[in-house]
Design a protein with these regions (language model features):
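Interaction-interface detector
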Residues: 1-161
Length: 161
């Protein structure tokens, strides 16, 4: 196992470059299929984790807490937003510890998907979000613009430790 240097205070870009040069990419079989209720006519979206990003998540000590990204999104939502001025949130906060693959997918959801999609994902009339394996997706992209999450989908809630 490779030991991660103490990256607190190191620019996130430098951490990611170190990881890309040092860590073996990790190709996850999981992906996230999601629908945005604010775009009801849009097809389902599919989010796949980048193999280098997954390697960082599983290694630990590289990625900032997801809350840092939430703070930056709050800034972006302000009407007078022009550019980020709080990059220190990504660079100076203590990097998070190693994650399991499942926990990394949850982190990815909270980082990259709109919060209104994942916050109450299981409270709607139909599922808005599904974590599945790539093999569960259609093997062809024909009719891709018509993909939707099935309303008959049975959701099993599973706690990730």
């Amino acid at each position: 196992m490779i030991t991660t240097p103490d990256f607190q205070g190191t620019h996130l870009w430098d951490r990611l470059c170190w990881a890309k040069e040092t860590l073996e990419p990790y190709r996850s079989e999981y992906c996230v299929v999601w629908e945005d209720q604010e775009e009801p006519d849009a097809p389902a979206k599919v989010t796949h984790p980048d193999p280098n990003w997954m390697a960082c998540a599983i290694q630990g000590g590289i990625l900032p807490p997801v809350e840092a990204y939430w703070e930056l999104k709050k800034d972006e939502a302000k009407p007078d937003f022009t550019k980020h001025t709080r990059g220190y949130l990504l660079h100076n906060t203590k990097p998070i510890d190693a994650m399991t693959e499942e926990r990394a997918i949850e982190y990815l959801i909270m980082k990259d998907l709109p919060s209104h999609v994942w916050q109450n994902w299981d409270k709607a009339n139909k599922p808005r979000l599904v974590i599945c394996t790539k093999s569960q997706l259609p093997s062809t992209r024909v009719w891709r613009n018509a993909w939707k999450i099935s309303e008959e989908l049975t959701i099993t809630k599973q706690e990730v430790a």
